[in-house]
Amino acid sequence: MLSESSSFLKGVMLGSIFCALITMLGHIRIGHGSRMHHHEHHHLQAPNKEDILKISEDERMELSKSFRVYCILLVRPKDVSLWAAVKETWTNHCDKVDFFSSENVKVFESINMETNDMWLMMRKAYKYAFDKYRDQYNWFFLARPTTFAIIENLKYFLLKKDPSQPFYLGHTVKSGDLEYVSMEGGIVLSIESMKRLNSLLSIPEKCPEQGGMIWKISEDKQLAVCLKYAGVFAENAEDSEGKDIFNTKSVGLFIKEAMTNHPNQVVEGCCSDMAVTFNGLTPNQMHVMMYGVYRLRAFGHVFNDALVFLPPNGSDND
């Protein structure tokens, strides 16, 4: 009996040491790029109204016409109902949108990535977008079909950001030493970040197709690892009051949480007035959001926004 107990304890100890070793190797692999650059995490805020009013009317008109966002939607055949919902709703406000599918789908037009691996799909979609549209768009927004995005608010947030700088924006999450932008809230890359990412896609030592790890990590973490090698780091996007504008939950869930945690300040405790994304929506909720954001109007009440972003010609502005 004593011998069996001793063998059991040895097995537990060896197992614990092995797990610890694996964990250390994982952190070394993910954090490898941190030795190349020192970076303090930033919280980037949207401009306030006073900043916009300082811009001349002619400049505002030029900005509203020239500011262009290319949208990338990663979809799978099982997402066909969500695919239909985003196609009928908010993606009409992108200056250009392409759907990248894991396989050929007859129901909707898409670009076939011929893989079900989300990281490979993301890599291929970014390469396609850069190769084809690098001279036409300065900002690239990637999202899931469960995400609802308000593109006008995204453009407003990016208004004073220079796309020739390496921006990598959204809702940031920390995992060990790695900070990354969660795909749940959508990911924004500037053209400079796209250039740097594209230069690394063919270098497996820095941006491997399979992550090069003992276990597989999510596609948004893999993207952050690759970008880190290029000196591009995750930035959390916030409004002028410090509230997150890229959200990984639905409006309904935020309101439910606010009613529990801040019963006397439900609206203030919920979400930013300039929110860009919400996630985890059903197809019906997509259409409800579209109604609330673009269609519902209070008669006689006029919004005097300093800047107007119009959707591309031929799209339904709702």
UniProtKB/Swiss-Prot annotation:
GO terms for cellular component: membrane. The chain crosses the membrane at residues 7-26. Residues 1-6 are cytoplasmic. InterPro entries: C1GALT1/C1GALT1_chp1. Gene3D superfamilies: 3.90.550.50. Its main location: membrane. GO terms for biological process: protein O-linked glycosylation. GO terms for molecular function: glycoprotein-N-acetylgalactosamine 3-beta-galactosyltransferase activity. Keywords: Chaperone, Membrane, Signal-anchor, Transmembrane, Transmembrane helix. Associates with core 1 beta-3-galactosyltransferase (C1GALT1), probably not with the soluble active form. This is C1GALT1-specific chaperone 1. It comes from Bos taurus.
